[in-house]
Amino acid sequence: MLNKSRGKLLGVLALFLVMVWYSIYREDSFYFPVQDNRTSCPLGEVERKAPQLIGNYSRAQPLFLQLRDYFWVKAPSLYELPYGTKGSEDALLRLLSITHYSLPDSIQRLNNAPVQGYEQDVGTRTTLRLFYPESAHFNPRAENNPDTLLVLVPFKPMDFLWMEAILNDKKRVRKGFWKQPPLIWDANPEQVRILNPYYMEVTAAKLLNLPMRQPRKVKQKPTTGLLAITLALHFCDLVHIAGFGYPDSAQGKQSIHYYEQITLKSMAASEHNVSREAVAIRRMLQLGLVKNLTYF
């Protein structure tokens, strides 16, 4: 089923819009020029160019984790979350047993932000919505389409426990989060997916050159925005990005996202290496791997 779905994915003209208003604190400023989006979608174009940026580039990995992959594990994961599942297999098995599924036929867009009230700027269609517990403060039914897939990006074992408790209506998990996640979340289990940590590993190791094993007090992780682009590079023939920018740190009042008033200053102590992310995105633009739709 996976191979069949992957074949459909590669055969479909996929337009992958990452609508994350993504402005980050740093000392220097990066401005990505607007590129002409009146471009045809050449089949296999991204797949041909991606190896120039991503070493050992492969489209063989599944997008989501599936139950069948964890009953008889012949090659256990080498890394803990968010780059692997080492040490979290039991919790993952329980969660996967709730969210059994098959892959969709096509992926058109990835969006991790509100739609209602912003339709003119971000459109109305959301095929995939990336989230993690602390970012799940949205209505799964009101802010999505009926067939939107809710994709959990697991950063830590507690994320699996929270998702399991929500879907099974068990005692809620309250500790172990940097921000309190929702205690009530009206989601259809059949629409929930667990992202394959492989793509977080590729983003960190191949695009940002971050070590997979870091001291506990120094934990640098990719942002979900850069992760979203990495996913697109592995599944689409044409990748457009919108809203990505890195203004000068002097613009302290600049909001991070289009839908809230949190400013750049809040990113000063984050776990994200935004300098490397800016360089990675600029390299993608230079290679023609992605097209920029907006000027920040």
Regions found by a protein language model. Give the residues of each.
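Metal-ion/cofactor- or nucleotide/acyl-coenzyme-handling active-site neighborhoods
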Residues: M1-F296
